[in-house]
């Protein structure tokens, strides 16, 4: 273990990864990616937007995130060793990684407590998928400028004029009504091609992208420019 090896080399950096952590009632339990997704509430968060039951992320997301987090921890330990001359034992769990990954946005609603706090859906709920004539696209409007740009791009004058939706605060406060209304008005875009839809939103600086298929990625110009493939 670490203690024996550290006696041989005090500069040793040693990473231990577990499912649930070294202590506590779940310590030592076997864990796989879907198990951690469930225990960390990730599957509950994933199902929030549609208002349905828990839903797993269709990826081994926690295996990969834990590996990335471990690499970052080792890099930090290497930096610390340059200052102190000593190594350390890094204890990392998949569960801690999952909670830390979700908390900045998904955890906001349970961090602030009390009757005076206005609880809102996570910011990711502002994202929208839209079905078009030849595929799908995604867009997201957070700022009032982006919302105004969306309305100009798609001629959504009535939506923009509605006082329930004119500011980010009012759109968040009326999240369900906004989502329902937006889904309704977006029906008129179904005859648009993906390229036409994106061109309209790009012209107004509204963040948007086409929905890709895995088999398309190796020929994607942006990924080729990034030298991913």
Feature map (PLM): residue ranges:
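Short, surface-exposed loop/helix-turn segments at secondary-structure junctions
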Residues: 108-116, 154, 162-163, 220-229
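Aromatic-enriched alpha-helical interface/lid elements that frame and gate functional surfaces
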Residues: 126-204, 208
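Short secondary-structure transition/capping segments
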Residues: 27-28, 171-175, 220-225
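Short secondary-structure capping/turn micro-motifs that flank functional sites
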Residues: 23, 167, 217-218
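A glycine-rich dinucleotide-binding beta-alpha-beta segment and adjacent secondary-structure elements
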Residues: 203-229
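Active-site-adjacent "lid/gating" segments in soluble enzymes
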Residues: 1-137, 141-145, 149-152
